[in-house]
């Protein structure tokens, strides 16, 4: 029995050291957190901009596209806008109806973004990078500013990480 425990302990130790070395020395993706977005690309019609951007992909799951839920008349800016940025492998539907209820309570326009690769096939997810998602965050913040004087951001999981990284950049806040 002692021999079995001894070998089990050694195996666990070797595995821990191996995984630790892999985590420290393993390959890492280069992440460019400086990715930005030119807000002038949004133009005067944000709905049209989002439709054109999302039309580039034929495999987006219905209902998870980038979009604005207008508090009142379409195209009318509100004092506050709410932006929802979802988590990894999720979509705008992740915590609904929470963003809708917050926006409704504030009388705010609501912007839903879709991070690159999300709401599509597994292959599309595999091609996305953290830099792509940082650009998506910059685009979403610009869109939220275009439809509201101030922006309330709701984010979950990876969305929260992206917003935290964006908060460190004066050009995005």
Give the positions of each predicted feature.
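Short, surface-exposed "cap/lid" segments of acyl-processing enzymes
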Residues: 61-115
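Loop/turn elements at helix/coil->beta-strand transitions in domains of secreted/extracellular proteins
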Residues: 108, 149-150, 172-173
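Extracytoplasmic/secreted proteins, especially bacterial periplasmic and envelope-associated proteins
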Residues: 93-97, 132-139, 161
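N-terminal membrane-anchoring alpha-helices
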Residues: 2-45
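Conserved hydrolase catalytic core segment
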Residues: 165-173
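N-terminal cap/lid segment of alpha/beta-hydrolase-fold proteins
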Residues: 36-77
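Gly/Ala-rich beta-loop-alpha elbow adjacent to hydrolase catalytic centers
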Residues: 154-163
């Amino acid at each position: 029995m002692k021999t079995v425990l001894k070998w089990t302990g050694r195996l666990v130790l070797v595995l821990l050291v191996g995984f630790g070395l892999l985590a420290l020395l393993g390959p890492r993706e280069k992440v460019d957190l400086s990715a930005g977005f030119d807000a002038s690309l949004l133009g005067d019609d944000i709905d049209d901009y989002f439709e054109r951007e999302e039309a580039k992909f034929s495999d987006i799951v219905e209902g998870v596209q980038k979009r604005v839920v207008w508090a009142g008349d379409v195209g009318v800016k509100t004092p506050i806008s709410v932006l929802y940025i979802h988590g990894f492998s999720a979509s705008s539907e992740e915590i609904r109806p929470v963003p809708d209820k917050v926006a409704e309570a504030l009388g705010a326009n609501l912007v839903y973004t879709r991070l690159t690769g999300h709401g599509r096939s597994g292959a599309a997810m595999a091609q996305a990078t953290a830099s792509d998602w940082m650009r998506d965050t910059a685009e979403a913040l610009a869109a939220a500013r275009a439809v509201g004087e101030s922006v309330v951001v709701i984010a979950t999981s990876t969305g929260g990480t992206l917003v935290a990284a964006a908060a460190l950049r004066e050009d995005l806040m």
